[in-house]
Amino acid sequence: MALTKAEMSEYLFEKLGLSKRDAKEIVELFFEEVRRALENGEQVKLSGFGNFDLRDKNQRPGRNPKTGEDIPITARRVVTFRPGQKLKSRVENASPKE
C-alpha cells in the first residue's frame, strides 16, 4: 500500500481541523516547493527525514533488449533521495505490516 497526497490531505484535515480545501492546498504547495527547488538545482533537506539531491549521469552505452542493437543512453540529471538517520532507525525498528 502506498501513501498518497489525498491521504496526506485527509490526515491534515482530521488532525489539524483544516478544511479539506486548505489541507489539499498545503500538501500541493509543499510538493510544488520541493519540485521548484529541484528544478532550480537546489538540494532539499528535510530534517529528521532525508535529503533530495540532483545527480548528473554521464552518457553510457546501452542495448535495445528486443533487437540487441547497441544504443547510447544519453546523459541526464536524476533526483536521488538519501534517508536521514532518524528515518533509517524508525524503518529498521518498525514491525512489518502484513
UniProtKB/Swiss-Prot annotation:
InterPro entries with a match to the protein in the record: Hist_DNA-bd, Histone-like_DNA-bd_CS, IHF-like_DNA-bd_dom_sf, IHF_alpha
Ranges for region Disordered: 49-70
SMART domains, alphabetized: BHL (SM00411)
SUPFAM superfamilies assigned: IHF-like DNA-binding proteins
GO aspect biological process, one term: regulation of translation
PROSITE patterns according to UniProt: HISTONE_LIKE
Keyword terms, alphabetized: DNA recombination, DNA-binding, Transcription, Transcription regulation, Translation regulation
Alphabetical list of Pfam families matching this protein: Bac_DNA_binding
One Gene Ontology cellular component: cytosol
A GO molecular-function annotation: structural constituent of chromatin
Domain of life: Bacteria
Quaternary structure note: Heterodimer of an alpha and a beta chain.
Role played: This protein is one of the two subunits of integration host factor, a specific DNA-binding protein that functions in genetic recombination as well as in transcriptional and translational control.
Record family assignment: Belongs to the bacterial histone-like protein family.
Protein name per the record: Integration host factor subunit alpha
Organism listed in the record: Sodalis glossinidius (strain morsitans)
Taxonomy of the source species: Bacteria, Pseudomonadati, Pseudomonadota, Gammaproteobacteria, Enterobacterales
